[in-house]
């Protein structure tokens, strides 16, 4: 029997193992059910860090994740994202040739002294595909300048595009002043924002992201290894993303790895040593995979529930979600998950539009709601004909009178 609370109706549905649930932050391990037996977050030797699940977006661990820090060459992740978006839009192709200008020549630019380079020379004609690898694998500052000039006409214009995407992605603690990440006043980011840029790279420009797993690149007879040492770690399936270092920034690393269908992204900023940033990132990723799992309980178009509809050309409405639901939960707790839904009103009246929000799905663990998603109409339901609506009106009156 339905119980009405302030014109909202709650219907409890015990879900089978097909249903799962939400996020529990590892930063609050005390809130976990004791049978989960999740130890605390490992001690991480860095100024700031974060660990998120790629699909659910849930934060599993964090410390000083919103503190603004010098990103160093993590900046190149946004450079790469802008390039990937431009190629996705058809503005240029990997086979296009880029003529290298003087501003991308290390010898003529003292700011490049001692920094990571692809070793370009003025007048060279280099395919976009090679410059991208110079950025993503070799962390070449000269390659960043060459691609910025080619893609936007100037470095300043390209930086403007970078900051436009900062706004579009909703990043709260990031602003870029350079295309390469060398120290500059007013340039900053945070561990959280860098993890979100990594998430955007994987989601929005997968062709661009696929380059990050390549372990080496040779240009003009100079062979350089990918600076992300975790690519060689056989205990993790790491396929990206980017390192960064300046004296001011310390040692930074954003890394992503998969285990089955689960993908995690870690961001470590202000690490102490070159190898230390890898060790700390590995701690986070290993801990996340060992003690959490991400499940996909509801898919777009799959009916979660159905409800009677009044005054429509259909008697019932199929209800579900308008996008796939991913939930990150303590490993082994899926069997304990339940779900319920709440309608925004006690009755559904036609017309109803496809994807119209009519309520909320609550995912529950140990009796607590730990995640929510909008409950939507899966198919449009127009108004019924005149006689059908009259009949529904009479039925509804009896329903109100006699319950």
Curated annotation (Swiss-Prot):
Enzyme Commission (EC) number: 3.4.16.4, 3.5.2.6
Signal peptide segment: 1-29
Residues annotated for substrate binding in this entry: 242
Membrane topology: Peripheral membrane protein
Cellular component aspect of the GO annotation: outer membrane-bounded periplasmic space; plasma membrane
Keyword Cell inner membrane: yes
Stated consequence of mutating residue 213 to X: Complete loss of activity
Function: Removes C-terminal D-alanyl residues from sugar-peptide cell wall precursors.
Entry protein name: D-alanyl-D-alanine carboxypeptidase DacA
Lineage start: Bacteria, Pseudomonadati, Pseudomonadota, Gammaproteobacteria, Enterobacterales
